[in-house]
């Protein structure tokens, strides 16, 4: 299973790394895709890199730079802990444990990747997504779920965190 969350690029206007990010809006996108050939659920999360950096700094009482190679191993530790505490999935009534694959930064966006093994079919998926709700009450989380080529999507405005999809 791979989880994807993203923040829209090109919408960042910060004056310092310690100042809260200022965007016209705050958005993250999580994409969940059933890969039937590998029997995995792939999850990717895309978000603004500076928002992710700042919430990880706040939660872990440390100063980091998401672009710095020296901090990559720390982010590889903090990102899965953060995402797993804010993104919960249930497939056909069973809670899903997903493994962290890694992250990459591209311009203003951070992409975080996860995967759950041994999932060959999905009839129903229940999602609780509060990613970056602890960063701003302006947060919007968009979720895309793709099963057998059929895509369903929803938008969760703060404080709403739950979405249910049936296939």
Residue locations for each model-derived region?
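Bacterial Sec-dependent N-terminal signal peptides
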Residues: 1-23
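N-terminal soluble domains immediately following signal/targeting peptides that reside
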Residues: 20-167
């Amino acid at each position: 299973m791979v989880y994807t969350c993203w923040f829209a690029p090109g919408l960042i206007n910060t004056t310092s790394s310690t100042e809260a990010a200022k965007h016209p809006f705050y958005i993250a996108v999580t994409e969940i895709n059933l890969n039937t050939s590998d029997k995995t659920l792939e999850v990717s999360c895309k978000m603004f890199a500076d928002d992710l950096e700042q919430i990880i700094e706040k939660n872990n009482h440390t100063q980091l730079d998401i672009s710095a190679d020296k901090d990559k191993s720390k982010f590889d530790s903090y990102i899965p802990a953060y995402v797993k505490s804010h993104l919960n999935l249930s497939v056909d009534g069973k809670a899903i444990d997903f493994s962290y694959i890694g992250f990459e930064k591209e311009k203003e966006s951070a992409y975080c990747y996860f995967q759950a093994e041994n999932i060959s079919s999905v009839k129903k998926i229940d999602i609780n997504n509060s990613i970056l709700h602890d960063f701003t009450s302006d947060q919007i989380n968009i979720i895309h779920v793709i099963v057998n080529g059929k895509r369903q999507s929803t938008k969760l405005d703060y404080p709403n965190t739950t979405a249910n999809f049936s296939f």
